[in-house]
Amino acid sequence: MSVSRIYIANVSYSSSEEDLREFLKDFNFSSVLIPCHTVRRFRRNEARSFGIAYVDFTSSEEAVRAVEELNGKEFGGRVLRVRTHNPYQPPKPIKERFGTKLQQLKKFAKYEDTAASGERAPTDAQDHPDQPQEGHMSPDVVLVNGTTDEEQQLANVINDPVTNADAPGTEQNISKEKAISEDTVYCAFLPKETTDNDLRNYFTDYGSREIWIFRTKNVSNSRFRFRNRNHTAALVTLSTELPLNKVIEELLGKKLLGTKISIKPAYIYKINEVKKIAEQSHMLATEYRHQNGNSDVVIGTPNEALLNSTQVASQIIGSNPEIEVSNQNSSSIANVAETNGNVGDTPITKLDSRNNIKIVNIGNPQDKTKKNQPNDNKELNKIDLETKNDSLHLESICDPIISIDMSGMTKQSVGSNKKKNKKKKSARGKEVRKLSVSNTTTQ
């Protein structure tokens, strides 16, 4: 395409079109244009040049000669940059570049038909042999002549869409991720205080076999205030024979704790991810260990925690002959064997995050003395302990394993730990508090 217009850059702002015509008097040009824009001032407006110019010549040969002679030449105190003008072409619409959706489907269908017939799908280079092939690769693996039978068999396995179904990006793999459960729904935008009992009551007409509730953590960054909220969601497995679409349609508009919620069919791969995370969390909680002196305390399942919790209680309370520890889920009673020594300097914190007990050492327990020690043959139902500083606090997380009656303990303030070798102050004016530990269940 022949172009008879040139583009001149770095033109002086003080140069006019008449000055440029005088500069180009040795060439056969037809028009000179210096584009400008209006600068608005307080009292009047001014026209300011863009620093460029366009010159039209009588022929393309004359334009080429002007570019060769004028490029790099000085005009108005500036060195000019001259080149041929490139006409502006707007970008093509997306439909023209890639075709409509129907054209794309037909193009891919052509590859599928040729692959099913055993022939190699035509490429763009085969359709247009004059154009070089750029950025296109055939989906098949083609081996050159002289290959062995094993290599050819390997190529057939790679090309086989059935054996290569698990490859990432294939339709089979994508369909697995988008598979929807037939009995589990995903409930979003639940109230913060939602419990499993609330969800059971909500789905009482359809039955709930399994419920998974999970919550997101708050974002403390003030720049993202829209994320600073508690998002609670749940996966509920229903036992009804109705299809999920029918269940969702019937529950449309029904509120949970006065709040509208969103119910959708759950993806199967999301259900598997939640169950996998729950299993890993349970294993970590089971294997959690806390070192206390020379012994390791392991809190496992609720049945194992009953025996382990007695060892923990014996280490914390000190040298006491026996304490009744009850499991309220069963009638079994475990006795704590006599142990010597006190708790170490490291406070005992949460031992199990889900299933069992939480033991907290508020300070360094002082020496404890027994009152009214019973005979060995007499069953011990209650132990009174005296302490002058701090106390012991055992708290049940879910089903209580250790039962403690704190009603016998008077009000006290938790202060800083005192050194063990510090002399005891006189008991004048000091209140001696009693800690009553009793069993709330009877055997």
UniProtKB/Swiss-Prot annotation:
It comes from Candida glabrata (strain ATCC 2001 / BCRC 20586 / JCM 3761 / NBRC 0622 / NRRL Y-65 / CBS 138). PROSITE patterns: RRM. This is Regulator of rDNA transcription protein 5. Residues 112-140, 408-443 are annotated as: Disordered. Gene3D superfamilies: 3.30.70.330. May be involved in the modulation of rDNA transcription. The keyword Transcription applies. Residues 121-133 have a biased composition (Basic and acidic residues). One of its GO terms (cellular component) is cytoplasm. The keyword Membrane does not apply. Residues 4-87, 183-268 form the RRM domain. The gene is RRT5. Keywords: Repeat, RNA-binding, Transcription, Transcription regulation. It comes from the Eukaryota. Residues 417-427 have a biased composition (Basic residues). It holds the Pfam family RRM_1. Belongs to the RRT5 family. GO terms for molecular function: mRNA binding. Signal peptide: none annotated.
